[in-house]
């Protein structure tokens, strides 16, 4: 799960902060269930290796598209073709050949910090118009605990901050990755960004 805080910059430069949470269940290489919750919306994404479904429970609406591929490919398709953003999207690419390591302009070890009670190595990176920092637990099971992204293309330098909590021994069944429409829900077309 993750807690996310982001900033929106108004025309006069004033920053507004917003928050959301996401619970994500993953069975690699090709199953995912994500629930994103903010005060403004609840959105769910299901992927069982054959079908990807986006559900908006408050509107009793969902869209399903056929897809076979790994999670990184799914996330890229949803964003590029449909404009759907996934929380923690980059984490599905890290450690794979698709990770955009060639785009990193600079990197540094910024020392160590505690995130909750976990001692973490702190790294800072510059990549295009983005600065990002990550805190990874030290020891036998290194996992990201915090991620900060700063948008350098905006003079106000808005940031997003994510804290991660990991469960490496989940007890779910594969059936949680298959979407079953709730009673009264309506299927709607997920329109491609290139359609007018």
Regions found by a protein language model. Name each.
Residues 53-54, 63, 102-194:
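Gly/Pro-enriched, hydrophobic low-complexity segments
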Residues 4, 69-71, 151, 170:
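Residue-level detector of flexible, active-site-proximal loop/helix-junction positions
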Residues 54-89:
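Acidic/charged, solvent-exposed loop-and-adjacent secondary-structure segments enriched in E/D, K/R, S/T
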Residues 1-61:
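N-terminal mature ectodomain segment of secretory-pathway/periplasmic proteins
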Residues 31-46, 74-75, 185-196:
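Hydrophobic transmembrane alpha-helix bundles
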Residues 97-100:
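Edge strands and adjacent loops of beta-rich recognition modules
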Residues 91-93:
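Extended amphipathic, helix-rich lipid-handling scaffolds
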